[in-house]
From Swiss-Prot:
Protein's cellular compartments: Cytoplasm
Miscellaneous remark of the record: There are 2 substrate-binding sites: the catalytic A site, and the non-catalytic B site that may play a role in the transfer of substrate or product between the active site and the solvent. Alternatively, the B site may bind allosteric effectors.
Protein family membership: Belongs to the class-II fumarase/aspartase family. Fumarase subfamily.
Name under which the protein is recorded: Fumarate hydratase class II
Catalytic residue positions: 185 (proton donor/acceptor), 315
Keywords recorded for this protein, A-Z: Cytoplasm, Lyase, Tricarboxylic acid cycle
GO molecular function, one term: fumarate hydratase activity
Enzyme type, top EC level: lyase
Described purpose of this protein according to its UniProt entry: Involved in the TCA cycle. Catalyzes the stereospecific interconversion of fumarate to L-malate.
Recorded name of the encoding gene: fumC
Superkingdom to which the source organism belongs: Bacteria
Length: 463
């Protein structure tokens, strides 16, 4: 163990760790739970420190030597392998101050170590005076939240969503000539194609992509420069423009200064809105996964209109059983995301006066939702959707037996006569044709002329 100091006194920390006194205190006082601060947030914080050092150096608020030491230490952390030095849990101060200081301490000590100094000496690099210069946890942490959210959405969620949507598009084309019976209220309706059904799924996800893309607009606004309460106290002239410039270079994202720092520190409406778009996506995915599970139910005593890929045995007692496991896993992920949405919404209400104090749990839930959805959508696309096959025999049988084909006769016979045909066929176990002819409404030839499932698919499908 080695001795570290902060404003409250001495704290003993492990000799081989780069963090300091404030991280040590947080480890002691918030030791419960297993939920570590997400690495995406740590990386975002490190990027902010790197860019702030460059900005402070440009403004001659930080000497070139210390600037270069901080930048080099930041780059070393970003290259990976030092995750053990960031041990803090999500459950800490609601401003994220302790994780901000964790990053400050590790950067300072790493810079000191690389130049032959003594860990914990704060010389020549001080975690507050140099690494945290021109910053406050209150503007740094929400900035890190937005950076982590944007990069996770664009880096993993959107590509995974596009991948699934393209797989559904491919199936819509593959199944474009497979006529089936539509269902409303879980009951038989008029004919459509399986491809039309899949095109609906694809479009639903395309709309989700648009919503998520729109939510990025507000996430591009960064709180950096607001410092403690939004007034920008202790921020040198020109710092905000320079740090934003360097962050844009570092991340490749079009970040801009927040339009109002008081709002940027005290609320997280942008993240609440963005997570809301994830909850909408979860709703859409549950609908799609549920539909596909039902369409393939059976295979002999259910709907059985599609065949699932045979990925693994489905039962420990029933041999030969194949279950829609990818569908079920996706629905569990979506359930978690919808639960996270409630947490994010409530946490978003806790912007008491000038500072929201639920920041860590907001970004933890947000990133968990993004990571779970990204993985689950890729798995669902690759191991389920891409392997779906149509059971054409079952589709044809269902179409031939459907009573709702009588809808094609409504313009010819009227609603009331068509109702009599359908009810007679149902109660007497007749075909629609048999019921129609026995009632004397049409001849067999006339019936066949008007009731053609392939002509009931909508103008675009007929063309």
């Amino acid at each position: 163990m080695r001795q570290e100091n902060d404003s409250l006194g001495i704290v003993m920390v492990p000799e081989d760790k780069l963090f300091g006194a404030q991280t040590g205190r947080s480890k002691n006082f918030f030791s419960y739970g297993k939920e570590l601060m997400p690495i995406e947030v740590i990386q975002a914080l490190v990027k902010i420190k790197k860019c702030a050092a460059k900005a402070n150096g440009d403004l001659q608020c930080l000497d070139a030597k210390r600037r270069d030491m901080i930048v080099a230490a930041s780059d070393e952390i970003l290259s990976g392998g030092l995750e053990e030095h960031f041990p803090l849990k999500v459950w800490q101060t609601g401003s994220g101050t302790q994780s901000n200081m964790n990053v400050n301490e590790v950067i300072a000590n790493l810079a000191i170590k690389r130049h032959g100094g003594e860990l914990g000496s704060k010389n020549p690099v001080h975690p507050n005076d140099h690494v945290n210069k021109s910053q406050s946890s209150n503007d740094v942490f929400p900035t890190a939240m937005h950076i982590a959210a944007v990069q996770s959405i664009k880096g993993s969620l959107i590509p995974a969503l596009e991948h699934l949507q393209k797989n559904l598009d491919a199936k819509a084309l593959e199944f474009s000539r497979d006529i089936k019976i539509g269902r409303t209220h879980l009951m038989d309706a008029v004919p459509m194609t399986l491809g039309q059904e899949f095109s609906g799924y694809s479009h639903q996800l395309r709309s989700c992509l648009e919503r998520i893309g729109f939510s990025l607009t507000h996430l591009y606004e960064l709180a950096i420069g607001g410092t403690a309460v939004g007034t920008g106290l202790n921020v040198p002239e020109g710092f905000v423009d320079k740090v934003i410039y360097y962050l844009r270079q570092e991340t490749g994202e079009p970040f801009i200064p927040a339009s109002n720092y008081f709002a940027a520190l005290s609320n997280h409406d942008a993240l609440v809105q963005a997570h809301g778009s994830l909850a909408v996506l979860a709703c859409s995915l549950i609908k799609i996964a549920t539909d596909l599970s039902f369409l393939g139910s059976g295979p002999r005593c259910g709907l059985g209109e599609i065949f699932f890929p045979e990925n693994e045995p489905g039962s420990s007692i029933m041999p030969g059983k194949i279950n829609p496991t990818q569908s079920e896993a996706l629905q569990m992920v979506c359930s978690q995301v919808i639960g996270n949405n409630q947490s994010v919404i409530f946490s978003g209400t806790k912007g008491n006066f000038e500072l929201n104090v639920m920041k860590p749990v907001i970004i933890y839930d947000f990133l968990q939702s993004v990571n779970l959805l990204s993985g689950a959508m890729r798995s669902f696309a690759d191991y389920f959707v891409s392997g779906l096959k149509v059971n054409r025999g079952q589709l044809q049988q269902n179409v031939e037996r459907s009573l709702m084909l009588v809808t094609a006769l409504a313009p010819v016979l009227g609603y009331d006569k068509c109702s009599k045909i359908a009810l007679k066929a149902f109660h007497e176990n007749l075909s629609l044709k048999e019921a129609c002819v026995s009632l004397g409404f049409l001849s067999e030839q006339e019936f066949d002329t008007h009731v053609v499932p392939g002509l009931m698919l909508g103008k675009r499908e007929r063309e």
